[in-house]
């Protein structure tokens, strides 16, 4: 799967909006993930106690983790598909330490699309959404390949 230069530009244009508030976007995305797929919360020992959206919004740790997640994803997206060096340690930790199933990466991808659309409707139309979906699918496909190399059946 390859994105065109125009598709990558759409992805990076919306990502510039994310970078204006990485932690806030990340927190919103994690809240959307946890509300839509409560089973994902079980993978996060330090967030398991957060039961309500208000508790999640008040959590500085959740905001920090959202910042970490989106900072890593931004670094990967900026590589425009040439993300082998960035992907390897991420796949290693997510497969061997955290044991995050690929399905959960699909869930967070959906949360990313939803939050970007809700926060930036004028800048995240159908073309940009399609490009971001394609970029996230490429990321998941490449992570899945690394998982397989590591013997993780996520």
UniProtKB/Swiss-Prot annotation:
Its EC number is 1.7.-.-, 1.11.1.-. It is an enzyme of class 1 (oxidoreductase). Keywords: Cytoplasm, Heme, Iron, Metal-binding, Muscle protein, Oxidoreductase, Oxygen transport, Phosphoprotein, Transport. One of its GO terms (cellular component) is sarcoplasm. InterPro entries: Globin, Globin-like_sf, Myoglobin. O2 binds at residue 65. Heme b binds at residue 94. SUPFAM superfamilies: Globin-like. PROSITE patterns: GLOBIN. CDD domains: Mb. One of its GO terms (biological process) is removal of superoxide radicals. The modification Phosphoserine is found at residue 4. Belongs to the globin family. This is Myoglobin. It comes from Megaptera novaeangliae.
């Amino acid at each position: 799967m390859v994105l065109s230069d125009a598709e990558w530009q759409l992805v990076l244009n919306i990502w510039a909006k994310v970078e204006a508030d990485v932690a806030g976007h990340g927190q919103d995305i994690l809240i959307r993930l946890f509300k839509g797929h409560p089973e994902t919360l079980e993978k996060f020992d330090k967030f398991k106690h957060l039961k309500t959206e208000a508790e999640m919004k008040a959590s500085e740790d959740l905001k920090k983790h959202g910042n970490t997640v989106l900072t890593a994803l931004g670094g990967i997206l900026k590589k425009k598909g040439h993300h082998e060096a960035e992907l390897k340690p991420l796949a290693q930790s997510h497969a061997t330490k955290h044991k995050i199933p690929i399905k959960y990466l699909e869930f967070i991808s959906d949360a990313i699309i939803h939050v970007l659309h809700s926060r930036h409707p004028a800048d995240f139309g159908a073309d940009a959404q399609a490009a971001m979906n394609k970029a996230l699918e490429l990321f998941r496909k490449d992570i899945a390949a690394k998982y397989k190399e590591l013997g993780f059946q996520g």
